[in-house]
């Protein structure tokens, strides 16, 4: 296995500062690699943002490449309604066209993350027949059935993905992704994440949860997650406790804790993110308004003020009404 780490991000200009914080943390935490090449799928960044990211890479003597994605995304016949943020996320479907042909694997990382540990162990992971490796997500079985997958199969969070590029090229997964998007008339359940899960099917490796510690895992126990999301299986409580104590990648997903760059966030790793952001050229960026939708803010209030059993009852039944009755 090569000692070169290939990492990929995608972003528009709105998320460029948070990409910068994540990238800085990646480089700080992975000095053991002899070479790190970072590919930025550019969905509309300014020249100033690109220069800022180049400055961060240069601080660590690492390589960075920018790939304009507008023409690629234009191939997608998307009908997303109000979900405009999902458009840039679809860029990860084009990884085979972004990375060089001699690159057999890549670690895709969402911008809203902080890397706190070495990635050397998972980078050397043998794929076998698998197309992706990732962490099981906290979503209910509706999303599996909605994209035609067997109930009980671990649904992978696409925010952190180790991608078998060699197999993606050989089996032309891009064409399969586009086929799924057409099948759902441009509105796949869970967007790009649903598309990737639908195509990869059972050919996935489930990584330890410490490699993608999403916000829900700070709010709920393993038992509660299985109950409120109607999951047949999930990580154990010991798995969650160990990951929270020593995370490799913290993923600041939308949730009850808010996001660290927004006002009112109570995320336990909030200051770690803000410290990383402060060390980038965007260090003076003020906190942004809380962007969570009204319903999620209401659930946050109930979470903080209601008995836990009542909250779980409300949350579970909301999931049932939104998904399982469809």
Over which residues does each language-model region extend?
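A glycosyltransferase accessory/donor-loop signature
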Residues: 1-11, 170, 174-326
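Hydrophobic targeting segments
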Residues: 6-9, 26, 37-40
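Histidine-anchored nucleotide/phosphate-binding helix
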Residues: 16-31
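Short loop->beta transition adjacent to catalytic acidic/histidine clusters or analogous donor-positioning motifs
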Residues: 30-39, 64
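Short internal beta-strands
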Residues: 36-44, 134-135
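Short, charged/polar "capping" segments at the starts of alpha-helices
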Residues: 44-51, 142
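Active-site-proximal specificity loops/subdomain of glycosyltransferases
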Residues: 49, 55-97
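GT-A fold catalytic core of metal-dependent nucleotide-sugar glycosyltransferases
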Residues: 66, 70-72, 88-140, 153-155, ...
């Amino acid at each position: 296995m090569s000692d070169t780490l290939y990492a990929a991000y995608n972003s528009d200009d709105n998320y460029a500062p948070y990409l910068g914080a994540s990238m800085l943390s990646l480089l700080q935490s992975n000095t053991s690699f002899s070479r790190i090449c970072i590919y930025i799928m550019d969905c509309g960044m300014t020249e100033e943002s690109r220069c800022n990211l180049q400055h961060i890479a240069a601080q660590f003597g690492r390589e960075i490449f920018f790939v304009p994605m507008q023409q690629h995304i234009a191939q997608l016949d998307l009908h997303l309604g109000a979900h405009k943020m999902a458009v840039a996320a679809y860029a990860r479907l084009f990884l085979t066209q972004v990375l060089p042909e001699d690159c057999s694997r890549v670690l895709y990382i969402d911008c809203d993350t902080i890397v706190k540990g070495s990635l050397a162990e998972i980078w050397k992971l043998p794929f076998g027949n698998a197309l992706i490796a990732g962490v099981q997500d906290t979503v209910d079985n509706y999303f599996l059935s909605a994209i035609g997958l067997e109930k009980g199969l671990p649904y992978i969070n696409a925010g952190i993905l180790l991608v078998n590029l060699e197999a993606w090229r050989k089996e032309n997964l891009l064409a399969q992704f586009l086929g799924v998007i057409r099948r759902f008339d441009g509105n796949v359940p869970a967007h790009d994440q649903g598309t990737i899960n639908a195509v990869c099917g059972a050919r996935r490796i489930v990584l330890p949860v410490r490699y993608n510690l999403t916000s829900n895992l700070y709010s709920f126990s393993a038992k509660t997650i299985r109950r409120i999301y109607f999951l047949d299986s999930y990580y154990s409580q010991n798995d969650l406790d160990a990951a929270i104590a020593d995370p490799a990648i913290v993923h600041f997903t939308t949730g009850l804790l808010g996001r660290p760059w927004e006002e009112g966030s109570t995320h336990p790793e909030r200051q770690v993110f803000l410290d990383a952001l402060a060390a980038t050229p965007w260090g003076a960026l003020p906190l942004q308004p809380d962007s969570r939708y009204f319903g999620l803010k209401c659930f946050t209030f109930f979470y903080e003020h209601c008995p836990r059993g009542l909250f779980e009852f409300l949350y579970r039944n909301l999931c049932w009404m939104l998904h399982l009755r469809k």
